[in-house]
């Protein structure tokens, strides 16, 4: 009897270990998140959720507080006075949130753009799905351009001389591939203003072409 009991315990652990090797039912991983047009649509919808987070709250208000239209009064309780007084540092938590927020959106667009384009090249999707995929790609390119444009507006100075355009370090860190890592040294340093705006204009051009193709066949 004891041997039978031990055998049942061993079998239970074996079954449990097998279940642990499986992904939870209904879950999606990086490798299969774009494995159908419907999944691409779901991921694209998620990009608009990210967009809502970077087009409200501090992403909008903090810039307005620095303008002449805002007047601090006693009832303000000293909130956001660092921005009102121009005492803004790289360590200011609101600054880090804005910077990280836009790059989170960019990471999502890179995942969609890289993944869908790679699958299109290998003929992974049905031929008749290209029309719909053009829409998702076009929107992703526009959202990436929008994010980089807002980052440039907030974290890059305006150039005063033509030679400033090509100076390294005056632009943004430009990441166009999805390669998340905890090692910050693997990410590119700040580029030039020319490279930054060239990428923004290139993404806008691709978005326009892809969305025009979609609308022509709508």
PLM segments and residue spans:
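Membrane-proximal, proline-rich intrinsically disordered regions
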Residues: 18-67
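Short, surface-exposed recognition loops and adjoining beta-strand edges that mediate ligand/DNA contacts
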Residues: 34, 60-69, 127-128, 155-172, ...
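Sec-dependent bacterial lipoprotein signal peptides
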Residues: 1-16
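Short alpha-helical hairpin
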Residues: 68-90, 174
């Amino acid at each position: 009897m004891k041997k039978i009991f031990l055998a049942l315990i061993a079998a239970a652990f074996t079954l449990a270990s097998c279940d642990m090797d499986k992904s939870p039912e209904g879950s999606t991983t990086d490798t299969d998140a774009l494995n159908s047009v419907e999944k691409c649509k779901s991921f694209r919808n998620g990009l608009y959720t990210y967009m809502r987070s970077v087009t409200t709250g501090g992403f909008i208000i903090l810039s307005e507080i620095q303008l002449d239209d805002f007047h601090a009064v006693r009832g303000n309780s000293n909130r956001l006075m660092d921005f009102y007084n121009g005492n803004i540092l790289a360590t200011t938590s609101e600054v880090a949130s804005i910077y990280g927020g836009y790059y989170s959106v960019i990471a999502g667009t890179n995942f969609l753009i890289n993944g869908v384009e790679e699958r299109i090249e290998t003929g992974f999707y049905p031929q008749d799905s290209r029309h719909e995929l053009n829409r998702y790609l076009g929107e992703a390119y526009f959202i990436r351009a929008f994010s980089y444009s807002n980052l440039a507006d907030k974290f890059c100075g305006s150039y005063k001389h033509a030679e400033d355009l090509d100076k390294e370090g005056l632009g943004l860190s430009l990441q166009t591939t999805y390669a998340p890592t905890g090692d910050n040294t693997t990410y590119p340093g700040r580029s030039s203003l020319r490279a930054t705006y060239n990428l923004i204009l290139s993404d806008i051009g691709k978005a326009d072409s892809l969305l025009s193709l979609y609308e022509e066949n709508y």
